[in-house]
Regions:
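Mature, function-bearing regions of proteins
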Residues: 1-232
């Protein structure tokens, strides 16, 4: 598999107690963890930006994470959808790994979530659609409760991911990522057209947080983070 780039629109929608919707354009890489592209300054993929030991490889760390949960891919292919480190910076609210067995069948999906406090948490899904309890503090306006409904089909020519949080009080939050793969000829043009894309993701999320705070939404204190085995 060659690395691919998807030009995407990312949407966030909060229903209550304050309604807030925002969208922004960006791009994401889909890469094979055994054949990571190296484009200095414009695209770097480092283990320290993802789950596990920063001294190992991303692939080795993912295999270790899965082994700790009784899963052995037998050397099967793993593809990762993520922002690359660009000009020394990266922020990935969500990184998705599609984990295949040696025969090519899908064994599981891993959804790695990062917050703006440099913490991470990985959710192991049995397939591309699953429901899991929320176990990680992400937004300062939501407690750690509720359940995520994730739909994370592996991309082909198009990309369509969605995550919905349903909370006990009936309030919900939804995020989606939709886009299309760009041609190999347009790959570098896409990167150059969005040189600060990954930094802009972090800035937009923080700015929306400031807006919600100024509108009177109360901040939920951040609980002590309990690192997962093989993640942080």
């Amino acid at each position: 598999m060659k690395a691919s780039i998807y030009e995407v629109t990312i949407s966030h929608a909060r229903s209550a107690p304050l309604r807030n919707v925002f969208r922004y354009r960006s791009y994401l890489w889909l890469v094979d963890l055994d054949h990571l592209p190296r484009v200095p300054w414009l695209a770097r993929f480092r283990a320290r930006d993802h789950l596990g030991d920063p001294r190992a490889t991303i692939r080795a760390n993912l295999d270790r994470f899965l082994a700790g949960r009784g899963i052995d891919l037998g050397g099967g292919r793993v593809t990762m959808l993520a922002h690359a480190r660009v000009l020394g910076y990266v922020f990935n609210p969500l990184t998705v790994y599609w984990c295949h067995r040696a025969d090519g069948s899908l064994a599981c999906v891993v959804a790695e979530v990062h917050n703006t406090y440099r913490q991470r948490h990985a959710y192991l899904l049995p397939g591309v659609r699953a429901e899991v309890p929320k176990d990680f503090y992400v937004s300062p306006f939501y407690p750690v409760d509720g359940r995520y409904r994730m739909s994370l089909p592996e991309p082909d020519a198009s990309l369509a991911l969605s995550v919905r949080l349903d909370r006990p009080d009936g309030h919900s939050f939804a995020a989606s990522v939709r886009g299309r793969a760009v041609s190999s000829r347009a790959l570098f043009a896409t990167v150059l057209r969005h040189p600060w894309s990954t930094a802009a993701v972090s800035l937009r999320i923080r700015w929306q947080g400031v807006r919600l705070y100024l509108r009177g939404l109360p901040v939920i204190p951040r609980p002590a983070h309990q690192p997962q085995q093989g993640v942080q």
